Swiss-Prot record:
Functional summary from the UniProt entry: Cytochrome P450 monooxygenase; part of the gene cluster that mediates the biosynthesis of the brasilane terpene glycosides brasilane D and E. The biosynthesis starts with the activity of the terpene cyclase braA that converts farnesyl pyrophosphate into the sesquiterpene alcohol trichobrasilenol. Subsequently, trichobrasilenol is glycosylated by the O-glycosyltransferase braB putatively using UDP-GlcNAc as sugar donor to yield brasilane A. The latter then undergoes two rounds of oxidation performed by the cytochrome P450 monooxygenase braC.
Pfam families registered for this protein in UniProt: p450
GO cellular component term, pick one: membrane
Database matches in InterPro entries: Cyt_P450, Cyt_P450_E_grp-IV, Cyt_P450_sf
Keywords recorded for this protein, A-Z: Heme, Iron, Membrane, Metal-binding, Monooxygenase, Oxidoreductase, Transmembrane, Transmembrane helix
Residue sites binding heme per the record: 448
Membrane topology per record: Single-pass membrane protein
UniProt KW Transmembrane helix keyword: yes
Organism name: Annulohypoxylon truncatum
Places the protein is found: Membrane
Transmembrane segment boundaries: 4-24
Protein name according to UniProt: Cytochrome P450 monooxygenase braC
Main localization category: membrane
Amino acid sequence: MASLYLPTIWASTLTAATIFIVAVLSKWLRKPRSFDVPIVGAESGDLNVLKARYVQEADALLREGYEKFKDAIFQVITPDGPRVFLPRKYAHDLKDYSRHEASGMKALADRHIGHYTTIDHESDIMLGAIKIDLNRNLGTFVGDVEHEVAFCFETQFPACDDWTPIDLHDKLLRVVAQASARIFVGYPMCRNEEWLECSTKFALDVMTGGEKLKQWHPYLRPIAQYFVPEMTRIRGDHQRALELLLPELNRRLAEPADPDSSPHNDMIQWMQDRARKTGDNSFDNKELANLQMLTATAAIHTTRLAIIHALYDLAARPEYVEPLRKEILEATKDSNGVLQKQHLTQMKMLDSFMKESQRHSPPSVATYQRKAMIPITLSNGFHIPAGTIVQCNTNILDETPPDWGDPHAFDGFRFYKLRNRTPDDINKFQFASPTYDSMQFGFGKDACPGRFFASNQIKIILAYILSHYDIKFEDSVVGRPKNFMFEVNVLADPTKMVLFKKIR
């Protein structure tokens, strides 16, 4: 009878031995590259403390690095190993490199281990569709986006006849996702519940699954990925996206050819047209579905967060509401309140408020992230080996130009006043303008190609809210809620509700 237990004993022993070896190897193989530059917080001597500080208070670490080293390069210890941070001035050195030499996309993919989370795919078709086709058609989409925004508020929000608490993180996810889908996959697909759920959950699976898988050494991730539930869901997300898109793609194929009718004006059509023009035979329905997921990931969550930050700033500073509301009403008075392209351009105070909100609550306290695809030498002689990820330490308010006014105060009309100084300034200081002093969207020729689309969406949604609702915080909230940090990412406090009340 004892012999019957031998296979079980051997299996248990082998499993235990494997777990032990994997655990030991994971620690032994985790040898981060170090650089000959000072380490912020090195005096503590405890790497685990420094890693925890980076996760919870990267803003304080980068501030400490700035105060200690000013214009010098420094490094910070992160859970992924040392990370190099450059003073803002070195953005001038990097901005002229092509994306094939210093890649923001590759840096982002590395941060989220894109080989496994599937966001490491850099497509010229997708880039062209965003950079050229989307930007070229922005004006034609204002009405469509506003229509989807209004539909979402009517169907997804409570009546708000009296002050009603709203979970902005939840509700605005739907608003931004549906407004974006109107441009990405067209109508009626933009209202497909399964598509909206698939496209919004994918980004969450990427971020959560990536963080879990990063706990394993790269040598062990090919096996470890199968023990991370989010990795399984990511593969399912891609398959489901394809299944959901196929009926729409087949419907379009079945439409009778009509030389007098315009093709569908959305991201699906632009990508298909570009694939045909370039003769890219690898572009199929599966590739189209994958790129749609990547585009949604890039567009939805950062836009939602920017709107939440702006609404928190408005609720904490109600004195801005009436001037902004008056500007919106004045801009749209000739169209009975219906938004058009030129109206967004006229909303200079709202644009200024958005930019000031972003200045105080940027998506990240370290921007202009690049992975060196070739060896790069900076103007001071510092050598960046190929494969190294660097970022610029750009969210230092003390570096604000003197003529901008008090850098630490919140002045919602700061950039409105700057734009009105002289005729030459009228087109400067806009929310979507990437400059040396404002790098939230990057800098140089490879600045975020979707920034104009994001700017329009944020402005349309904020204009709708200001035109239809009063907002305020609950009485228990004093001032503007403090942001949370996750590594270099700046997050609005998800525990706070904003009260909405419909304007009569």
